[in-house]
Design a protein with these regions (language model features):
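Surface-exposed loop and turn segments in beta-propeller and other repeat-based domains
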Residues: 1, 50, 54-61, 65-79, ...
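Predominantly five- to eight-bladed beta-propeller fold
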Residues: 1-8, 15-74
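Beta-strand C-termini and the immediately following turn/loop, strongest in propeller blades
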Residues: 5-8, 17-23, 49-53, 87-90, ...
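N-terminal targeting or regulatory segments adjacent to alpha/beta-hydrolase or S9 domains
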Residues: 14, 19, 60, 187-235
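A short loop-to-beta-strand structural motif that recurs across blades of beta-propeller domains
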Residues: 58-60, 108-110, 161-163, 208-210
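Short loop/turn segments that connect beta-strands within beta-propeller blades
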Residues: 63-67, 113-117, 166-170, 213-217
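Long hydrophobic segments that form regular secondary structure
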Residues: 64, 68-101
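Repeated scaffold domains used in trafficking and secretory/extracellular systems
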Residues: 84, 136-140, 182-188, 231-235
């Protein structure tokens, strides 16, 4: 068992959430490590191929001072899904769990109430081909409006765009309506009500900083000065 993945402390520091991985049923395959071309080493590493068992995953929460683990009752059978991320949902009572089907055609964000043992779907998307998880350019989910909503990057509409999702999953609002990809997300100005991002809606060889209102009631505003064409990066 590998218990070290994706550890997340609750905001109040009282709980620790983590993903437990059991790869004991995953077959091993030989891998050559040619670090020494004269005598290369061969190791056996676990690797799940199509139709063979994948690791079984579960989410646990433990008190920071020790004690028994409280396991989250996920709505799918073990060995049929992946867990991309586990984070605290803007408070110290609920977890936001990102689950992916094994075939990667379904993605869910589940809200798990640790104290009540309840779980609900906050967001779900499907695609007959492939769904990217929240990493790399799609990473950076962030809670806004006192935890009532969160900003999510998704390619559900064919472009990498930003959405505002209500906590109960009943409302979904598209922020970046241009038919172009968000190249990289920037910070969320919660007090000012802005979402910042890098994009190149008119010329793929250029990159500019844009921002848009979190309420979705404005057009994108280019922050990079108009007299500075080219590729821009910001920190």
């Amino acid at each position: 068992l590998d218990n070290g993945g994706n550890i997340s402390w609750s905001p109040d520091g009282r709980r620790i959430a983590y993903i437990q991985t059991d790869s004991s049923k995953v077959r091993r395959r030989p891998v050559v490590h040619p670090t020494d071309p004269t005598y290369p080493e061969v190791t056996l590493e676990r690797f799940a191929r199509v139709g063979t068992p994948i690791p079984t995953l579960r989410v646990g929460v433990v008190d920071s001072e020790g004690g028994a683990t409280q396991w989250v009752k996920l709505p799918s059978d073990p060995g049929t899904f992946y867990i991309n991320s586990v984070s605290w949902a803007g408070n110290s009572k609920e977890l936001l769990i990102e689950m992916l089907s094994r075939s990667r055609d379904n993605r869910k964000f589940l809200l798990a109430n640790i104290e009540k043992g309840e779980i609900a779907t906050a967001y779900e998307e499907t695609d007959p081909a492939w769904i990217d998880a929240s990493y790399s350019a799609n990473a950076g989910l962030e809670w806004i409006h006192d935890g009532k909503e969160f900003v999510l990057i998704s390619e559900r509409g064919g472009w990498r765009q930003a959405y505002v999702i209500s906590r109960d999953g009943k409302q979904r609002k598209l922020l970046t309506k241009d038919k172009s990809d968000i190249i990289a997300r920037g910070p969320v100005d919660k007090s000012g009500g802005w979402f910042y991002y890098i994009a190149s809606p008119k010329n793929a060889t250029q990159r500019y900083l844009y921002r848009i209102r979190l309420d979705g009631k404005s057009d994108p505003e280019r922050v990079t000065p108009d007299d500075q064409p080219g590729t821009h990066s910001y920190e």
